[in-house]
Regions:
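Amphipathic repeat-derived elements
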Residues: 1, 152-153
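A structured, charge-rich N-terminal accessory region that forms the first stable segment of a protein
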Residues: 1-9
Length: 153
């Protein structure tokens, strides 16, 4: 698959850790929706050592795609993720996505094992996620421009 998808290889090579799962996720145009939900498939989700972190990298998107997440206090954050950016998502919290545009939305979604190198790529906002019990802020963390958050496509 590495020869068939060199872009995926380029993106994955930035993670100096074990890669648990990689997939493409699509939302069809004209109202394609991922309903509000939480992902409770793995109790070891989080940014602590050895836990799984979920990262979204928009490959194809448009300005009419909205990702919405809710904090543990119920505050809502809406994000428009740009192509080539990279986002850490705390999937234990409620989230949803809708594509009201005319083009398909495709994300590369990667679950990686958390470690110091991966955490060093996050923006300073991630600090409050270290202890899940204290999380009260938004769930989407855009990764720092000078680190992982950068145009990679």
């Amino acid at each position: 698959w590495r020869k068939k998808f060199p872009l995926v290889e380029k993106l994955l090579s930035q993670f100096q850790t074990e890669i648990h799962r990689v997939r493409f996720m699509n939302l069809k145009p004209g109202g394609g929706e991922l309903e509000r939900h939480t992902d409770q498939v793995d109790p070891d989700i989080g940014i602590q050592d050895g836990r799984l972190m979920r990262v979204h990298i928009p490959i194809k998107t448009n300005v009419n795609v909205e990702f919405t997440s809710w904090s543990t206090t119920g505050s809502k954050v809406i994000a428009n993720m740009e192509e080539g950016s990279c986002w850490y998502l705390d999937i234990r919290k409620p989230h949803m996505a809708i594509n009201n545009g005319n083009d398909w939305r495709t994300h590369l979604v990667v679950d990686v094992v958390a470690n110091d190198q991966v955490r060093s790529m996050l923006s300073p906002d991630y600090e409050q996620d270290k202890d899940y019990e204290s999380e009260v802020d938004f769930t989407s963390r855009r990764l720092n421009d000078s680190k992982l958050y950068r145009k990679v496509i």
